[in-house]
């Protein structure tokens, strides 16, 4: 039976220079066995996290990490998502499963922040995934419209 550890946040003292909360310390706590996790509940967890990010987008950026990210604009949100995705890939290649799990959670969180930044709701993504369910990746990709790039100033996609 496999058990995974997650990060538990505990807030430390207030920083006297900025009057903002000091850095958040992270410590691990044990979760129930993976067999106890209901897949339907996993979607609900993501939906609830999206709601939290939505609520915090208008919060004080000095207090909320989500608000701080969103206040910096879509470019910074996308950059942070990319950084987290790269960290996830590094852990996958390194073979450190626990670190990969933690980085995967970071990727999901930052993906949700990205969705909030551009106005995508989780249900829209779940609907797209449902449409693709049961279709092979090759067949699904072949069914997409083919859009050929055009060089600047050309009215055709044909190569001269």
Curated annotation (Swiss-Prot):
Q: In which pathway does it act?
A: Amino-acid biosynthesis; L-histidine biosynthesis; L-histidine from 5-phospho-alpha-D-ribose 1-diphosphate: step 2/9
- In its UniProt entry, the species of origin is given as Granulibacter bethesdensis (strain ATCC BAA-1260 / CGDNIH1)
State any GO CC term: cytoplasm
Q: Which UniProt keywords apply?
A: Amino-acid biosynthesis, ATP-binding, Cytoplasm, Histidine biosynthesis, Hydrolase, Nucleotide-binding
The protein depicted here goes by the name: Phosphoribosyl-ATP pyrophosphatase
Gene Ontology BP term (one): L-histidine biosynthetic process
HAMAP family documented for this protein: HisE
Report the subcellular localization: Cytoplasm
Q: Which GO terms describe its molecular function?
A: ATP binding; phosphoribosyl-ATP diphosphatase activity
